[in-house]
Every structure is written in structure tokens, then in C-alpha cells.
From Swiss-Prot:
The gene is ddl. Its main location: cytoplasm. Keywords: ATP-binding, Cell shape, Cell wall biogenesis/degradation, Cytoplasm, Ligase, Magnesium, Manganese, Metal-binding, Nucleotide-binding, Peptidoglycan synthesis. It catalyses: 2 D-alanine + ATP = D-alanyl-D-alanine + ADP + phosphate + H(+). This is D-alanine--D-alanine ligase. InterPro entries: ATP-grasp, ATP_grasp_subdomain_1, D-Ala_lig_Van_CS, D_ala_D_ala, Dala_Dala_lig_C, Dala_Dala_lig_N, PreATP-grasp_dom_sf. GO terms for molecular function: ATP binding; D-alanine-D-alanine ligase activity; metal ion binding. Pathway: Cell wall biogenesis; peptidoglycan biosynthesis. GO terms for biological process: cell wall organization; peptidoglycan biosynthetic process; regulation of cell shape. Cell wall formation. It comes from Chloroherpeton thalassium (strain ATCC 35110 / GB-78). The keyword Cell division does not apply. The keyword Repressor does not apply. Belongs to the D-alanine--D-alanine ligase family.
Length: 366
């Protein structure tokens, strides 16, 4: 049996770099070795692509323990090792001559989850796992995604979106508009980041200004959202034109909200799968997740995050992650495991979906 060659793209020019490496390592370990052969391709924080030998060495590094270190000493040691590998590694790679059957981008955040790598793979004429250029770009930009969700009839929380220029030219006006429409407490987010990077909760004007300045360190666009007293629910979606939804999960954060530290560093947030809700209410969340998936033109996979108001049970869609995490604690594989789809089977299906979509595209007249 000829094994299909899978190019595993990981790392990348994003603040979610380490999470990408951890996700890729989990996928590499779970991949069905009887069907697939891995070609790892590591992308440095500077954007340099490394060959298979260096990439395998990086894939074996213990990033998971390193990011939990309070001193960050371990992560600095890993970064030094990577610098040495970069000095001795030359990347000369042609997807066609390498006979890559499918690429699996495990790149979280900008320059990987936003349509950039997807466009590159389209130009190379390579099948790849996950959403295409349009859906990746839509779901990466939280402001654009909210417009898409509202058009599809989904409820989003009250928010305002601003550009850096607006804040720099008249910060007083930005703050006044937020205070008038949203009132405290509020959340401030970069428009184009994931893993809750750059997100802050503001309880007063000084905190709001600080939160905006933090968000602008990551993006030229930011959102200010009205805080909702809510439970955090998540639904995973799998498929192309006929997607299916997973069980519903709930996250109970160890911090005031589910930020980067609560997700990956402290690791003490509680995950409840399935969520303790009625079957009828779970059905509403699943239907909303599928609606959002289709509205954004997603393919392959996505994790849809919701806020459920504690007193009224009103459902608000928060965001879609087109390349959800695949770490040992990530919700996406756990949610499908609850409905009988193992981690390895999930990866098999994602690769099959990518190849199906590629075959369908080759039939088009272009």
C-alpha cells in the first residue's frame, strides 16, 4: 500500500507559535502511520521555512513544558537551539517534486490561519486541510466575522470596531463612544488574533485605554465588546458541504475569563464535556454552529465559540476558529471524541475531506 505524503506545516510568524508546535506534535503522534508519511515543515517566527531534518528535531522539543515555566528559561533554551538549526538548514522544497499529496497547516493566528498560507498552497496547486482563502480571512478578522454572522441571522454581543488611526487621532472620542454604547465592564480585543492573545477586560476608563494600547500592539484594528455574564460553550464542526457538529462543551475558566494563561499556562480551567444542558438547548447550539460554519464558507474543520447569558440563556456567537488547537487539552478533538470519533480517525477524515475538495476543484472549468 502506497502511503500518502502529508506536509505538516507548523510554527509560523504569530504569537501563537508555540501552541502551533504543540498541536503539530500531537497530530504527528496520532497520525495513522499505515496510511500516511509525514513531511514536517517548520516555519520560524521570522518566517524562514526549514527542511525535514531540522523540522523533526523541533517537533520533538518539549514546548508544552516550556511555556508553563514561570521563568521562561526553557523556552529561551529552545529558541537558542532553533537559531543553531536555522544556521545549518537550507530550505529548497518543491511541493510537486516532493510528491506531497496533502498539506496540513497547523498554523494558528496571523500568517497561517488568515488565508495567507492557504493562498500559497492554492498557487502551488496542493490539496490542504481546512478552510480556503475566503473563509480563513473572514474568520480571522473578528469584526468582519461578526458582520457575516449577523447577516446569517445569528446573534452577536454589542460591540464597536476601530482602527489604530481613529484612536491615535481622537482617543477621547473612541472612549466616549464605548462608554456611551457599551458601559463597563468591557472586553478589548485585537481583531486578528487567536488563543485570547492581547485580550483584556476593562472596568474603568484607565483600564480601557491600557487595554486598547495592548490590543494595538498586535493589530491595527481592535474591538470593544460589552461584557456578558455568560457561560462559555464550544461546538466543533467537521465536513465540507455536509458538515456535522460534535457534542457541546463548556469551559469554566480559572481566571476572570478564558485568556491565554488560563488555556495553556495554568492549565487549571475546567472543561465539561458534554455540557450540562438540555438536549434541546444543545441542539440549538449545534444548529447555530453549523449555520455559522456555512455562512463563513468554512470547509474541513472549525470550532465555534458561544457565550450563553447565565440568566436568560440567550445565545451569542463569539467567534469561529478555522484551525482549532490540537494539543492534549484542546477542545476540538475532545468534543468529537465524545461522539465516538477518535483523534486518529478525526485526522484521517480531515485529510480525506481535503483530498475530496481538491478532486472536486480539479473538475472545474477555470
Amino acid at each position: 500500500m502506497n502511503k500518502k505524503k502529508v506536509a505538516l506545516l507548523f510554527g509560523g510568524r504569530s504569537s501563537e507559535h508555540e501552541i502551533s508546535v504543540i498541536s503539530a506534535r500531537s497530530i504527528a503522534n496520532a497520525l495513522d502511520k499505515t496510511k500516511y508519511k509525514i513531511q514536517p515543515i517548520y516555519i520560524t517566527k521570522a518566517g524562514k521555512w526549514l527542511g525535514a531534518e531540522a523540522s523533526r528535531k523541533i517537533l520533538a522539543m518539549d514546548f508544552e513544558s516550556a511555556i508553563k515555566s514561570p521563568t521562561k528559561k526553557e523556552i529561551h533554551l529552545i529558541e537558542k537551539e532553533i537559531v543553531l538549526l536555522c544556521q545549518n538548514s537550507q530550505f529548497r522544497f518543491d511541493f510537486r517534486t516532493a510528491k506531497i499529496d496533502v498539506a496540513f497547516p497547523v498554523l494558528h493566528g496571523p500568517y497561517g490561519e488568515d488565508g495567507t498560507v492557504q493562498g500559497l498552497l492554492e498557487m502551488f496547486d496542493v490539496a490542504y486541510v481546512g478552510s480556503g482563502v475566503l473563509a480563513s480571512a473572514i474568520t480571522m478578522d473578528k469584526a468582519v466575522a461578526k458582520i457575516c454572522f449577523e447577516h446569517a441571522g445569528l446573534q452577536v454581543g454589542e460591540y464597536l470596531a476601530f482602527l489604530r488611526r481613529e484612536f491615535e487621532e481622537n482617543r477621547g472620542s473612541v472612549v466616549a463612544r464605548a462608554e456611551k454604547k457599551l458601559r463597563y465592564p468591557m472586553f478589548v480585543k485585537p481583531a486578528n488574533m487567536g488563543s485570547s492573545v492581547g485580550i483584556s477586560k476593562a472596568h474603568n476608563r484607565n483600564e480601557l485605554i491600557e487595554a486598547i494600547e495592548l490590543a494595538l500592539a498586535y493589530d491595527r484594528k481592535f474591538l470593544i465588546e460589552k461584557a456578558i455574564n455568560a457561560r462559555e460553550m464550544e461546538v466543533a464542526v467537521l465536513g465540507n458541504d455536509e458538515p456535522i457538529a460534535s457534542a457541546v462543551g463548556e469551559v469554566v475558566p480559572c481566571n476572570e475569563f478564558y485568556d491565554y494563561d488560563a488555556k495553556y499556562v495554568k492549565g487549571s480551567s475546567e472543561v465539561i464535556i458534554p455540557a450540562q444542558i438540555s438536549e434541546a438547548f444543545a441542539g440549538k447550539l449545534k444548529a447555530a454552529a453549523l449555520n455559522a460554519f456555512v455562512a463563513a464558507d468554512c470547509e474541513g474543520m472549525a470550532r465555534v465559540d458561544f457565550l450563553v447569558e447565565k440568566e436568560t440563556n440567550e445565545i451569542y456567537i463569539n467567534e469561529i476558529n478555522s484551525i482549532p488547537g490540537f494539543t492534549s487539552i484542546s477542545m476540538y478533538p475532545k468534543l468529537f471524541a465524545q461522539v465516538g470519533i477518535s483523534y486518529t480517525e478525526l485526522i484521517n477524515r480531515l485529510i480525506e475531506l481535503a483530498l475530496e475538495r481538491y478532486s472536486e476543484r480539479k473538475l472545474r472549468k477555470i
